[in-house]
């Protein structure tokens, strides 16, 4: 998938494998995707064995961010109202765990990072 480099893919697959084994995990998000013209953001931390299903914090800009699964192939097909596709935030460096981002987003009604 064009969103991930090999290091990110490996890290997200390892996080996904840990959860699949039943390990209790609360990883740092590995990847931030967003739309520049539609106020949607995804902080992704895990990738399933299929290499397409990711898990993380999803904020569709509706004031109700939540943890969940999303297919990278679906994200690759999304464009905002001005025709701008979903993009990787190249400057994103996780500062806290996924659950901490989720708690802050639930309180604030959006991902603010």
Where are these regions (language model features)?
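Low-complexity, intrinsically disordered/propeptide-like segments
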Residues: 7, 36, 47, 75-78, ...
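N-terminal domain-onset segments
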Residues: 1-38, 110-113
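Acidic, aromatic-enriched beta-alpha/helix-loop junctions
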Residues: 44-81
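Helix-rich interaction surfaces within compact, conserved domain-sized segments
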Residues: 66-113
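Conserved beta-strand and immediately adjacent loop positions that scaffold enzyme active sites
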Residues: 30, 41, 55
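Short acidic/glycine-enriched loop/turn segments that link adjacent beta-strands
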Residues: 38-39, 52
